[in-house]
């Protein structure tokens, strides 16, 4: 969210560094409720006493539950294949071939036959909507499970409002939902199956976000989740990841909540009718049984929540959390594994295209201004969070945006404000019970309120979300120590060092009585999602930068003239001028001088930016305090990098040695 000067505010609460040293950028505190009823009471605010509070009569949907899904499908063979595919998805260990899947409702057909209804001619049987509910018959033939296929947003609205308590339409047309007791990700409950392949490929041990589980435990949880889903009406969505058509991933999401289905409809790339017809077997499947807990006495489980990833089976199982962001970030982790195997670099970054067609990547943690700076109306937005860099250029992984909503204001972030309309999912927001107007300043449920909407809702979005090879790689840091320059040009080794470090600084909340800035490091600016060792991603980044002529930059959006509490935050207009100078190529021909300790090259002048702020030492009145804070920050960088210092690619440590030499020098 923006502060008065327009930059994203610094987070002060609700985030903790985990025991293994990994900083989880968007995990959040538990919901502020003790019971489900209390949670629902927090969602809706009572209207003011002067506002009449009348209950409008409810009009039932005509035609019953199945009426929206009664149109045609012509290819009988293709439909049969789809039914077989659904059956395979819902197979479990005790039902290896999956439940029998038939068209229509066998119970309804039986009733019609008993009443002497004439049979329907075959020609008419084929006229059905592609989203018609398939009925999966359990082995015992005593239960029926509706499988709703690729519903539209309007149909998902109907399902959510009718069957999911806590689902409402807001005054702007968005769907307000509740994610239950979990209002943020649960990184400590994420597990990855460790087998012969992943034991060698993935990053394990200190600092890694990957917590192991075995195949047997995964199958136990998968069985539990699939059996639960088989007892319900489930929604199946088929979506795509990666706008690069040569490197797309086909994803199937099976969930029990329309909210989850609409969320993924917005966040993934929405296939055309032709792409759906030729969809075939998915590359990855998510089983979201988040309403049902895992057995916490199962091996490797530490709570009733578990997010399990099996890369060999290409499946993810979610239990015990209804927070939709687990699906988004789970798939991002999958892309962090699959794409590098194809020689494609996956990145946790924003990306835009300048007015002259040049592309820039923006890396940064919360509060650095990544969204603010990458969403520039002088250019086009390729994406705000997840990207791939291949030999074809850069491409957005997703088809939507997942924006924070706390303290959202129209005048500060009009693009996000205007995107909250019909089709958008609003998570855990509070609204007026009568008018349905959302109060974005109210965090009664959680501070981690979010909006998920298609990227087409942003006016400056570039569709398709692809671009040429980036010319600039911009690493953003909000330095609350006030010792990093507003902009520095980096050599390749420095780019790798600062990319692996993933530095920013947080300011402790005043309620704690602590005024000291707190350094935060998140490897590759997304430690919670990476699968391989950070040095592998850094090496791929350097290789592509060298191959395609990209330049690395370190941009400080934090403090100048003193640390937090003494100096002032660098003004947003100055930072925008710096970004403009990077886009235009002005800084490539500027004169540079080198700083102490970090050895950063800083320009002596930039058009529209006061020269006296370019070298931080000249903005401090207390030079001794500057030196003290500079050495302190350098020491924090050194300490953080110790966990990466011994890494070798094969038996060769030369790359790591080169990267280490680019760090602070005392």
Swiss-Prot record:
It is found in: Cytoplasm. ATP binds at residues 364-371. Its main location: cytoplasm. Pathway: Carbohydrate biosynthesis; gluconeogenesis. Keywords: ATP-binding, Cytoplasm, Decarboxylase, Gluconeogenesis, Lyase, Nucleotide-binding. Residues 1-68, 91-132 are annotated as: Disordered. Belongs to the phosphoenolpyruvate carboxykinase (ATP) family. SUPFAM superfamilies: PEP carboxykinase N-terminal domain (SSF68923), PEP carboxykinase-like (SSF53795). The keyword Nucleotide-binding applies. The keyword Acetylation does not apply. Residues 48-58 have a biased composition (Polar residues). It catalyses: oxaloacetate + ATP = phosphoenolpyruvate + ADP + CO2. This is Phosphoenolpyruvate carboxykinase (ATP). Its EC number is 4.1.1.49. One of its GO terms (biological process) is gluconeogenesis. CDD domains: PEPCK_ATP (cd00484). Disulfide bonds: none annotated. Residues 109-123 have a biased composition (Low complexity). InterPro entries: PEP_carboxykinase_ATP, PEP_carboxykinase_C, PEP_carboxykinase_N, PEPCK_ATP_CS. One of its GO terms (cellular component) is cytosol. One of its GO terms (molecular function) is phosphoenolpyruvate carboxykinase (ATP) activity.
